[in-house]
Amino acid sequence: MTFKTLDDLTDIAGKRVLVRVDLNVPVKDGQVTDTTRIERVAPTIRELSEKGAKVVLLAHFGRPKGEPVADMSLKTIASAVEEILDQRVYFAPDCIGDKAANAIADLNDGEVLLLENTRFHKGEEKNDPAFVTALAANGDIYVNDAFSAAHRAHASTEGLAQHLPAYAGRTMQAELEALEKGLGNPQRPVVAIVGGAKVSTKIDLLQNLVKKVDALVIGGGMANTFLAAQGVDVGKSLCEHDLAETAKAILAAASEAGCAIVLPVDGVVAREFKAGADNEVVDVKAIPADAMMLDVGPKSIDAINEWISRAETLVWNGPLGAFEITPFDKATVAAAKHAAARTRSGSLVSVAGGGDTVAALNHAEVADDFTYVSTAGGAFLEWMEGKPLPGVDILKQQR
């Protein structure tokens, strides 16, 4: 995988550098409640600022549908960016036109300016050539540090790279290098853990993974659908019975590709979906008709951890059970801790991503121990599905 990075950027003092960042952070009562995404892009902004560039930040926030919406203004985010960077961040009330141009013209070398929400213009999501040209007029160089938006062919993620010299920021670079280790050119054996509630949201993912990994562990509500497809009565467990044929096709594809499928052999069942509910461990073939499986059981955990022990590379998307409710977090926590320990010892490359996955690893207090944890959501999932990422592909073409 070849693309230009900040290492290739020299002599940029005084240059206007347009940096696409991900500032789509949660806000409550006007306050940013989670600054993770801002922290991720801070190193790129600081590096460009220290090199004397005029740093101009481009980002979207929410879904304003091509029109200005007051509570989706990036002005709300500017103070949080300032706090993390520990330097003044100026704000312009538009991302194109005179307001943007004048604010950029007023910048001194090394200063940072945040432009207004790119999605306040319909041309952003349409990747409209006229809008791209208007954005490009504000910069000499383009840096994309928003992998999380790389699956969208929008003006600020893909269009700009066709108009200006384009580079990957440090977060984009780290993400792409980690993903290359995960599935692009991994050390084998490769084990994938895929969990979560529904097979229907991850059909493309499963079909792609069985061709690329040595073993696929299926957990969460998804496992019930696969068990039911094999004739197992899963009681009142979450199950997509209408996807039985899809599940069978995925199992057949795995068999043909030589990919081992690891399904639960036992489970933790309960009759109520609440914290501290009465529960018991049963064989998956003995799930009571009035109960639901909410986590995989101890024998299944042992089997999963055995696969993690054999793996050189682990790719993880989705929890193994209803981890947000005690005691149905045991399997997810046990597998996460085992993977983290092997990663710390240098025996495993572990790459994880997806909102629930990040929350689960944080719950297990091991997120920092994984080789890489992606906060990219949709882009991470589409990468795992083997789909093209326009924002990445255009950077490779620039090389």
From Swiss-Prot:
Substrate binds at D22, L23, N24, R37, H60, F61, G62, R63, R119, R152. InterPro entries: Phosphoglycerate_kinase (IPR001576), Phosphoglycerate_kinase_CS (IPR015911), Phosphoglycerate_kinase_N (IPR015824), Phosphoglycerate_kinase_sf (IPR036043). Keywords: ATP-binding, Cytoplasm, Glycolysis, Kinase, Nucleotide-binding, Transferase. One of its GO terms (molecular function) is phosphoglycerate kinase activity. It catalyses: (2R)-3-phosphoglycerate + ATP = (2R)-3-phospho-glyceroyl phosphate + ADP. It is found in: Cytoplasm. Its main location: cytoplasm. The keyword Protein transport does not apply. Pathway: Carbohydrate degradation; glycolysis; pyruvate from D-glyceraldehyde 3-phosphate: step 2/5. HAMAP family: Phosphoglyc_kinase. Belongs to the phosphoglycerate kinase family. This is Phosphoglycerate kinase. The gene is pgk.
